[in-house]
């Protein structure tokens, strides 16, 4: 079966990690043609250009895999074959009002076009239920997968990391990726008077007095492992939350907003849900006094291995090819 996988994102996000893993697994049995119409250094004003590029996608495949954007343009492009939608999350409530209005219209178009898809893939029970409740059928839940062995660390490696970035002497609280929508501003305001190392990571998209580290993946994992608490206080409905899952695999307690599919992950691993920033300081104190919460998280997170992910995707391909 020949597969065409339409991509829009250029930057690496949690969903790109998931997508690349699925592609690598399917490519072991099927030809996978990746078609990327994304724009480097994408800005919201360029979205019409992305949609225009999507409309020009053409070709015949046995199966096309599409995200939200490619479902929008599905009736207008020049493709032939069956279609699978992979939807991580849908929430534009954090956007400026004008964008919310525009995306509200596009969402209605999306839901109408989605009925033409042969299958829908989601990554959490929250989003599976979301589509089923709207009357969609053939909705599949295929969870994230992680290489658990890559989350092994020795004490010397951790100590070196702390010394390198001067993160010793007091507990580390990881606030999250340095984006406003990740809740780092509100989290910092709640915790800034505590005797803690407050750390963000990734490109600094908001100015905070907290330390910001732009790290490669291994050092990012060392940050999660070194932290006493990891926060995932996203302000939008997540598909899952890769950072929370990675922190749990590091055995580090997690406090999250629980929005969208994140709640299933946090509650499954008996982590702490904080749905109001006013209570965050109290929750951090609780996590600092109960580090054993991290081991409960690990026990749950370690169940999401590669074998189940591989079997789920290959089973779906078999169903669609029959």
Language-model features, listed with the residues they occupy:
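A charged, aromatic-enriched C-terminal amphipathic alpha-helix characteristic of glycosyltransferases
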Residues: 17, 21, 288-319
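Active-site proximal beta-strand in glycosyltransferases
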Residues: 63-65, 76-97, 121
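Membrane-proximal helix-turn-helix segments that form the acceptor-binding/catalytic region
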Residues: 101-120
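Carbohydrate-associated surface elements
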Residues: 126, 145
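Acidic anion/phosphate-binding donor-loop and adjacent secondary structure
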Residues: 146-163, 168
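Conserved donor-binding/catalytic core segment of Leloir-type glycosyltransferases
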Residues: 166-182, 188-193
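Acidic donor-binding loop of glycosyltransferase active sites
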Residues: 225-239, 252
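Conserved acidic donor-binding segment of nucleotide-sugar-dependent glycosyltransferases
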Residues: 268-278, 285-291
């Amino acid at each position: 079966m020949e597969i065409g996988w339409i991509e829009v994102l250029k930057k690496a996000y949690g969903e790109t990690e998931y997508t690349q893993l699925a592609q690598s697994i399917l490519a072991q049995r099927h030809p996978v043609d990746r078609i990327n119409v994304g724009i480097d250094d994408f800005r919201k004003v360029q979205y019409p250009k992305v949609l225009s590029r999507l409309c020009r996608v053409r070709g015949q495949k046995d199966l096309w895999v599409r995200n939200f954007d490619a479902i929008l343009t599905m009736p207008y492009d020049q493709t032939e074959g069956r279609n699978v939608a992979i939807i991580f999350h849908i929430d534009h409530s954090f956007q400026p009002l004008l964008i919310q209005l525009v995306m509200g219209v596009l969402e209605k178009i999306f839901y109408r076009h989605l009925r033409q898809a042969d299958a829908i893939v989601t990554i959490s029970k929250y989003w599976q239920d979301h589509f089923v409740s709207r009357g969609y059928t053939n909705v599949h839940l295929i969870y994230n997968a992680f290489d658990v062995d890559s989350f092994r660390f020795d004490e010397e490696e951790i100590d070196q990391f702390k010394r390198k970035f001067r993160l010793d002497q007091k507990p580390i609280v990881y606030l999250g990726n340095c984006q406003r929508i990740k809740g780092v501003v509100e989290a910092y305001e709640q915790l800034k008077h505590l005797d803690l190392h407050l750390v963000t990571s990734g490109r600094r998209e908001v100015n905070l007095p907290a330390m910001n580290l732009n790290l490669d993946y291994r050092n990012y994992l060392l940050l999660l492992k070194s932290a006493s608490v990891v926060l995932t206080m996203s302000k939008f409905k997540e598909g899952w939350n890769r950072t929370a899952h990675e922190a749990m695999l590091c055995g580090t307690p997690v406090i999250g907003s629980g929005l969208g599919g994140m709640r299933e992950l946090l509650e499954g691993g008996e982590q702490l849900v904080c749905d109001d920033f006013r209570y965050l300081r109290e929750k951090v104190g609780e996590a600092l006094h109960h580090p054993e919460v991290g081991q409960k998280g690990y026990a749950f997170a370690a169940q999401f291995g590669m074998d189940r992910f591989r079997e789920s995707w290959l089973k779906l391909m078999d169903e669609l090819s029959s």
